[in-house]
Amino acid sequence: MTHVINLDGEHLTLEDVIAVARHGATCEIDQEAKKAVEASRKIVDDIVREKRVVYGVTTGFGSLCNVSISPEDTTQLQENLIRTHASGFGDPLPEDAVRAIMLIRINSLVKGYSGIRLSTVEKLLELLNKGVVPFIPEKGSLGASGDLAPLAHMVLPMLGLGHAYYQGQLLSGQEALDKAGIEKIALAAKEGLALINGTTVLTGIGALATYDAIQLLKLSDVAGALSMEVHNGITSPFEEDLHTIRPQSGQLATARNIRNLLEGSGNTTVATQQRVQDPYTLRCIPQIHGASKDSIAYVKTKVEIEINSVTDNPIITKEGHVISGGNFHGEPMAQPFDFLGIAISEIGNVSERRVERLVNSQLSKLPSFLVKHPGLNSGFMITQYACASLASENKVLAHPASVDSIPSCENQEDFVSMGTTAARKAAEILKNSRRIVATEIMAACQALDLKPENHELGKGTKPAYDLFRQHVRFIEFDKDIEIYEELNKASELIESDEFLAAVENAVDLSIQF
């Protein structure tokens, strides 16, 4: 990707984060932002020269804030900070999450409130642009005082320490720098703190989950519409007149999406044609999907505020004042990311119930478990079990992390957000729910092929079905088949941009009215 994103600390969007994290877009620092960074750094240099007492510059950290540090030890203080705070556990964060984290940290620093040298910010940018991805363990952050442990792991390779990925290989930090042609740096006063004190990790993980959730909301409407085709669903519950008298934005958008997807369908019905009403999982798609749309739209606004915010401490104002506060605290994002997890979980829950309706012969009027010879073959029986397992796991994961707190740092940091846990849970719920929705689409396409009378599909459901069938075949269970391979193909297809693009080329889909 040749697109270069200008970083000024003010205008970064969620789409920019995706472009950098997943599609290799490069970045540059805005010229005015460079001036702001340099002005802020001059104030820190003055503080050190004048031997003023400022937290994290000439003092220790956390409950050690009353320990004074001499000017000659300020550099060692910062390196010690990184070495001791790099205390994470677990598997590495995905590379796209780490790239998002690096980008968001740079964008925060270039606002010019952190007192970091421009050359240090440019070094982190060089790692990002040249594809050096620090090894960051996924666990170990309380979400206040920021994401200290994981961000310390981000900084290690800048010093020639730790580990990093480069061109798909996990290398020592120094080896990764050497292969990328990057020189290591030594940190100056306040720089270690400026690099690791903030909500960047939870925001990076949560930003990717938020973007993916928006795509999943559209996919869930496609899945619901395909289920409507199978069940000869009644279309009156999606009429605009019904929803304008309860003008919830997500509800209105969902009803419109379903109308667009089903336009021209020969399978849908009107009330009393086959039955008076449909079950809630079909009839209430606008209300259920719409509620999640509204929740996720709210989270997106919070994300776009946070990725353009300063979450450092202390901060240095444009007038030269040093303010020690709490912008590092993750609570403003912990609660939204818990909300995000709940909203995504509901999408998985309702999709799993529609999978059950598709495979249940009493409800679908099709062969049991969508197989031509039920009994000899079990068809989609255990596929529904697997979806139920994921949905139930989501219900456990949806328990809010932000309602918990464990005091730390000798009770100096006595109330923490657990926001990084909230973001990681939301990302896991997203993966589970996306699998369920992919299975609903697969089961609906199988069911459509089994229907004795199958009429023309709708304007949006037809391209969805056609593309799906190009990648995932109708399953003849009498022949040699391992169903998990087809399930994986289905998941890979809907995770790609190709599937949703094919539908959106035919009809407009949105998450807000």
UniProtKB/Swiss-Prot annotation:
Its PTM note reads: Contains an active site 4-methylidene-imidazol-5-one (MIO), which is formed autocatalytically by cyclization and dehydration of residues Ala-Ser-Gly.
Q: Which enzyme class?
A: lyase
**Catalytic activity, EC:** 4.3.1.3
* MF terms (GO), sorted A to Z: histidine ammonia-lyase activity
- Quote the catalytic activity from the record: L-histidine = trans-urocanate + NH4(+)
Naming one, the record's GO cellular component terms include: cytoplasm
A UniProt-annotated Pfam family: Lyase_aromatic
Q: Which organism is it from?
A: Streptococcus gordonii (strain Challis / ATCC 35105 / BCRC 15272 / CH1 / DL1 / V288)
List locations, semicolon-separated: Cytoplasm
Listed GO biological process terms: L-histidine catabolic process to glutamate and formamide; L-histidine catabolic process to glutamate and formate
List the NCBIfam families: hutH, PRK09367.1
Q: Which family does it belong to?
A: Belongs to the PAL/histidase family.
Q: What is this protein called?
A: Histidine ammonia-lyase
